[in-house]
Amino acid sequence: MDITEPAQRLIAEKLTDMLDDAGYLREEIETLAQSLGATNDEIEAVIARLQQMEPVGVFARSLTECLRLQLADMNRLDPVMETFLDNIEMMASGDLQGLRKKCSADAEDFAQMIADIRRCNPKPGMGFG
């Protein structure tokens, strides 16, 4: 990790200890800031740095954020994919036609979007012992 400032490094170490098994940070920023004696902005800045680490998606705070990080890394995060992610609950409920319409995507593009999402790892932290 390329965090050399001592206060940020301490925050990074504490945040690493707070990861769940899937690699997510589940606590709210305000709670993290209060428990670490830092400001919300300081916590956000360190999280942004940590999210640049491998595996991509670790330190996300939700499945959607995890997918966004991975899709951005694959250079597949465009406005249409953002719309898909903003409405991903439609995929979970099986409303693929409604989701495709919301994304204004043709069948081929929509199938590619689903394939890209399936290539993502929803639990990037599971590879750690």
Where are these regions (language model features)?
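Alpha-helical scaffold/interaction cores of sigma-54-like transcription cofactors
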Residues: M1-G129
